[in-house]
């Protein structure tokens, strides 16, 4: 079964390898691009590096807002909350991402949909290479 977490126009019928590349780094702002294996930019990530509210905006290649990522530092584990568009309101929460364990040699993340508030079992897993 297919599950569309973000808008369907950003879904591919087959698995796609994507890479996050730092495009420009200044003292106050970091910009990243997400590209496919051919180097085509699929998404852009914009956000302030040094700010009280650690937020990033994910846009498509044309600059249309897709979702907002908000970093929350917790006592036990860091987490990222992902919201629809440019919102950070709880009603627009799509999912939460957190590391599968505190110490990792290879990035492994657990994704919990907003409909899974207890976070006992993750809805998806993401592994880096």
Regions found by a protein language model. Name each.
Residues 1-129:
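Intrinsically disordered, low-complexity proline/glycine-rich segments
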């Amino acid at each position: 079964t297919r599950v569309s977490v973000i808008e369907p126009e950003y879904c591919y019928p087959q698995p796609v390898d994507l890479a996050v590349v730092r495009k420009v780094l200044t003292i106050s702002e970091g910009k990243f691009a997400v590209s496919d294996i051919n180097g085509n930019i699929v998404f852009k990530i914009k956000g302030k590096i040094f700010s009280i509210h650690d937020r990033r905006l994910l846009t498509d290649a044309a600059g249309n807002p897709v979702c907002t990522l908000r970093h929350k530092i917790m006592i036990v584990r860091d987490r990222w909350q992902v919201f629809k568009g440019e919102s950070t309101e709880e009603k627009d929460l799509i999912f939460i991402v957190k590391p599968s364990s505190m110490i990792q040699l290879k990035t492994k993340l657990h994704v919990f949909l907003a409909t899974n508030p207890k976070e006992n079992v993750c809805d998806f897993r993401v592994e880096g290479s």
